[in-house]
Each structure stands twice: as structure tokens, then as C-alpha cells.
Swiss-Prot record:
GO biological process: ribosomal small subunit assembly; translation
One Gene Ontology CC term in the entry: small ribosomal subunit
Record family assignment: Belongs to the universal ribosomal protein uS19 family.
Gene Ontology molecular functions: rRNA binding; structural constituent of ribosome
This protein's name: Small ribosomal subunit protein uS19
Signal peptide region: none
InterPro entries: Ribosomal_uS19, Ribosomal_uS19_bac-type, Ribosomal_uS19_CS, Ribosomal_uS19_SF
NCBIfam families registered for this protein in UniProt: rpsS_bact
PROSITE patterns: RIBOSOMAL_S19
Cross-referenced PANTHER family: RIBOSOMAL PROTEIN S19P FAMILY MEMBER, SMALL RIBOSOMAL SUBUNIT PROTEIN US19M
Source taxonomy: Bacteria, Pseudomonadati, Gemmatimonadota, Gemmatimonadia, Gemmatimonadales
Pfam family, one: Ribosomal_S19
Length: 96
């Protein structure tokens, strides 16, 4: 179920305040955040956020296509190393 329109999107107050002050000064700094649940607002476009993935901070540059999504969607928490496959030197028998 989605969030109520009456409540509006969730954004950490400190995060939004930092972006508003940076927009007023027209400066672009990397904003470090642990708030993966914050929704990306149109004011965030053009800024870079360092989003924590549980281990380190992943830089996320916000574009217009990201508006409405959560910051955590762009900072993966798990490392996918691929499925187990055949070794390169082992060949299949009975080549047809």
C-alpha cells in the first residue's frame, strides 16, 4: 500500500534543510546521509548524495528520472558475484 497523499512523501528533515540551504547559496557539495528511506524531491535534482549501504557511502547523482523514488534504491546493500558456472578449461563431451 502506498503512502497517503495527505501525509506527503517522507524526507528526513535535516536532509531537506541541507538541500534547501545549498540551493539558496547555489553550491553543490556531496551530502552524506544514512536516510535511505527518504523520497527524492524535485529540489534534489543536480545534487550528489553519499548514501550509506551498511558498509560504505555510495555516491548517487540525482537526475529528473529519479524523482519520487527512494535514495536507498540507488545504493545496493548486497554484492552479487554471479552464479556458479563452468570453468573455461572444461569442455563438454560429445560435441554435436
Amino acid at each position: 500500500m502506498s503512502r497517503s497523499i495527505k501525509k506527503g512523501p517522507f524526507v528526513a528533515e535535516r536532509l531537506e534543510a541541507k538541500v534547501v540551504t545549498m540551493n539558496a547559496k547555489s553550491e553543490k557539495k556531496v551530502v552524506k546521509t544514512w536516510s535511505r528511506a527518504s523520497t527524492i524531491l524535485p529540489e534534489f535534482v543536480g545534487h550528489t548524495f553519499a548514501v550509506h549501504n551498511g558498509n560504505k557511502f555510495i555516491p548517487v547523482y540525482v537526475t529528473e528520472n529519479m524523482v519520487g523514488h527512494k535514495l536507498g534504491e540507488f545504493s545496493p546493500t548486497r554484492l552479487f558475484r554471479g552464479h556458479a558456472g563452468q570453468k573455461a578449461d572444461v569442455k563438454k563431451k560429445g560435441g554435436k
